[in-house]
Amino acid sequence: MHKKLTKEVDYMDAVLYVCHGSRVKEGADQAVAFIERCKKNLDVPIQEVCFLELASPTIEQGFEACIEQGATRIAIVPLLLLTAAHAKHDIPEEIQKVYERYPQVEVLYGEPFGVDERIVDILVERINETNVDKHEDSMVLLVGRGSSDPAVKRDLNEIAQLLKGKGAFKEVSTCYLAAASPNLKEGLHLAKRTSYKQVFVLPYLLFTGILMNEIKEELEQLSTDAQQFILANYLGYHDGLAHILSHQVKTLLSSKGNQYDVYRYA
């Protein structure tokens, strides 16, 4: 997809942020608000937001909006936590469809956030923000979106181990909202069977949406006098996340794209 350049070229740069999308309008609105705040950290003339599914503008519409403003190089940045099918296949396929109509445009493709200790620090903050005094006998149930890609389970387990150390918890277990096991009900059931007096349920999600509502519904009436279930907030906007995203964009635009081929997952 990338042209081999023999001399320096002056580009009109653009950034196209690809969010997942949500049936819940608030979730899509939060994604846009997050990007609007992140834009201020970057000196890039053209910055657009689009969605993979369930919301608009689409990837095609976002790409074309960049072209209409004169972009000659577009850094496409997936606003996703972990690398799974969306980042490896779905987004690249959509990019390829529209790129074929604009082969003169240089396209760079970025990475999801991945395993990052700075994000784990934010998770600790979200637990602390519950304003519940942490019992020495407590655990965390880290709830991921889920994927059939084994790399997602590997990465979430790594994040769980980092969280266990940083948050000084005796145990951090994982479960998933879809496409992987244990699922949410199973994860909660396993936590219920433990002797821990507190279970912090921590959604590993960027924004609210149907999945966040599902977690809330499952948590209703689980707490007892002997065991307390506490729902922490999703990641949402955080200056630390904005800094990570800005750094990713700057790195991408300085790379000339030769290691950011959308086919690298094939």
UniProtKB/Swiss-Prot annotation:
GO biological process: siroheme biosynthetic process
Catalytic activity: siroheme + 2 H(+) = sirohydrochlorin + Fe(2+)
Gene3D superfamilies: 3.40.50.1400
Broad EC category: lyase
The keyword Metal-binding is assigned to this record: yes
Domain of life: Bacteria
Keywords of this entry: Iron, Lyase, Metal-binding, Porphyrin biosynthesis
UniProt: Fe cation binding residues: H20, H86
GO molecular function: metal ion binding; sirohydrochlorin ferrochelatase activity
Listed EC numbers: 4.99.1.4
Pathway(s) this gene product operates in, as recorded in its UniProt entry: Porphyrin-containing compound metabolism; siroheme biosynthesis; siroheme from sirohydrochlorin: step 1/1
Key word Nuclease present: no
Family: Belongs to the CbiX family. SirB subfamily.
Described purpose of this protein according to its UniProt entry: Chelates iron to the siroheme precursor.
Protein's name in the database: Sirohydrochlorin ferrochelatase
Species in which this protein is naturally found: Priestia megaterium
